[in-house]
UniProtKB/Swiss-Prot annotation:
Encoding gene per record: skic8
Domain of life: Eukaryota
Example GO BP: nuclear-transcribed mRNA catabolic process, 3'-5' exonucleolytic nonsense-mediated decay
Summary of the function given for this chain in its UniProt record: Component of the PAF1 complex (PAF1C) which has multiple functions during transcription by RNA polymerase II and is implicated in regulation of development and maintenance of embryonic stem cell pluripotency. PAF1C associates with RNA polymerase II through interaction with POLR2A CTD non-phosphorylated and 'Ser-2'- and 'Ser-5'-phosphorylated forms and is involved in transcriptional elongation, acting both independently and synergistically with TCEA1 and in cooperation with the DSIF complex and HTATSF1.
CDD domains the record matches: WD40 (cd00200)
Organism (species): Xenopus tropicalis (Western clawed frog)
Lineage: Eukaryota, Metazoa, Chordata, Craniata, Vertebrata
Statement: the UniProt record of this protein carries the keyword Lipoprotein: no
Protein name in the entry: Superkiller complex protein 8
């Protein structure tokens, strides 16, 4: 049990190019934690966390261009990656084998996100549509139309009720998944929304933008609860802690920041990366944070619980 924030491990030269996306998974055989990284070197790598360090478990080859987004299914056994080659690939985390490839259409897959029941996979598109694919079939089942600009970021609410999308013009849309209806349009940012994340209780939506601000919205009434500043440049990623109390952000200012949700304050700043930090994620129990950056490194941090 840790009482303070500290860096546990640095994996240098983790990839041959910038690392833009990261996730946590689990090995169902021995219960060990896995870190999944996606890079502009076209590769997805699966790392095993053991003895306070990362060990490369498998390298997943198949994408023809850089990997821009990875997500692990809530069920924990499947991983999805999307690439600049306009393909989404589904992988078996255990074996490292590709389950299927989905052609998302010309330049049409950016970020990918699994639904809470692991049955669907959502991806944003250039024409302002969120496309929903069946995980079992690999077929497009339906689309949610924002009638807006290129969608950079998407997130499901953990209760399965909502899907939020963030566009390149700073507009955020929240859809009701059951009806497919657009519920709310939020115009709090004037620049691209790089990332958004719902709180585990699905009550709050946190958004990250190139305008340097993080905003917290109360989902039900679509009201702005807070605007947080602290990063010196684009905010590239945000992720919630599993216990609802904190979230983490990363930025092109090379920092990773941990925020207290109720106090609306930054409680710790990590300055260990040498370049812009594209991805951050809490592990399942909130004891660790992983970050990835343009410096080709993966960092794992210890969090007080």
């Amino acid at each position: 049990m840790s009482t303070q924030y500290s860096i546990l491990f640095k994996q240098e030269h983790a990839h041959e190019d910038a690392i833009w996306s990261v996730g946590w998974g689990k090995n169902s055989n021995d219960g060990s934690e896995l870190v999944i990284s996606g890079s502009l070197d076209d590769l997805v790598k699966v790392w095993k966390w053991s003895d306070e360090r990362l060990e490369l478990q498998s390298t997943l080859e198949g994408h023809q261009l850089g990997v821009v987004s990875v997500d692990v299914s809530p069920s924990g056994n499947i991983m999805a990656s999307s690439s600049l080659d306009a393909h989404i690939r589904l992988w078996d985390l255990e074996s490292g084998k590709q389950i299927r490839a989905i052609d998302a259409g010309p330049v049409d897959a950016w970020s990918v996100a699994f639904s809470p029941d692991s049955q669907h996979l959502a991806t944003g598109s250039h024409v302002g549509k969120v496309n929903i694919f069946g995980v079992e079939t690999g077929k497009k089942e339906y689309s949610l139309d924002t009638r807006g600009k290129f969608i950079l970021s998407i997130a499901y609410s953990p209760d399965g009720k909502y899907l939020a999308s963030g566009a390149i013009d700073g507009i955020i849309n929240i859809f009701d998944i059951a009806t497919g209806k657009l519920l709310h349009t939020l115009e709090g940012h004037a620049m691209p929304i790089r990332s958004l994340t719902f709180s585990p209780d699905s009550q709050l939506l946190v958004t990250a933008s190139d305008d340097g601000y993080i905003k917290i919205y109360e989902v039900q009434h679509a009201s702005l609860a807070a605007t947080l500043s602290g990063h010196g440049s684009w905010v590239l990623n945000v992720a919630f802690s599993p216990d609802d109390t904190h979230f983490v952000s990363s930025s092109s200012d090379k920092s990773v920041k941990v925020w207290d949700v109720s106090a609306r304050t930054c409680v710790h700043t990590f300055l260990d990366h040498q370049d812009q930090v594209w991805g951050v994620k809490y592990n399942k129990n909130g004891s660790k944070i992983v970050s990835v950056a343009d410096d080709q490194e993966i960092h794992v941090y210890d969090c007080p619980i």
